[in-house]
């Protein structure tokens, strides 16, 4: 009798787990990125130069030969990085750009670049580009803020 109850309980609990796993109503499109139309435009010369600086001789293998990564990088360059000057005094609680490690995985010759608002290369820094929340960094000794917007998901 105990064996019958034991096997019956195993059958019930294993079936319950399978049913709850299959009945997960959560949208399956939560991880699909929505890209604005401007990612259909080819890389500009400036964007290609920034990519070459960050990826060196691994640029084709790591980015250009991978269409999803091409779209991600275009989205980062064109839609997700905002740099502006803030006029308030109390910016000390915002993390500094100098606290972000330099991204040297593919090009170990990269040194800490001097900040230039017009030529800022976000790929030189090890930012978490896949965070679900907005990230803000302050450029050292300035009132410039770098905002990294999260990806837009469908």
Task: Describe each PLM feature range.
Residues 1-26:
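Bacterial Sec-dependent N-terminal signal peptides
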Residues 24-154:
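Short beta-strand and adjacent turn/loop elements
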């Amino acid at each position: 009798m105990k064996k019958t109850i034991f096997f019956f309980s195993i059958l019930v609990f294993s079936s319950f787990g399978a049913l709850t796993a299959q009945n997960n109503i959560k949208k399956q499109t939560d991880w699909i990125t929505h890209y604005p139309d401007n990612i259909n435009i080819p890389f500009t010369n400036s964007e290609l130069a920034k990519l070459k600086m960050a990826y060196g001789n691994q640029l084709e293998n790591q980015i250009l030969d991978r269409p999803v990564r091409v779209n991600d990088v275009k989205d980062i360059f064109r839609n997700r990085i905002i740099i502006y000057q803030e006029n308030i005094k109390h910016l000390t609680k915002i993390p500094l750009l100098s606290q972000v490690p330099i991204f040297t995985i593919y090009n170990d010759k990269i040194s800490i670049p001097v900040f230039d608002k017009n030529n800022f290369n976000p790929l030189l820094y090890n930012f978490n580009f896949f965070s679900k929340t907005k990230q803000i960094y302050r450029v050292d000794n300035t009132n410039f803020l770098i905002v990294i917007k999260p990806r837009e998901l469908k």
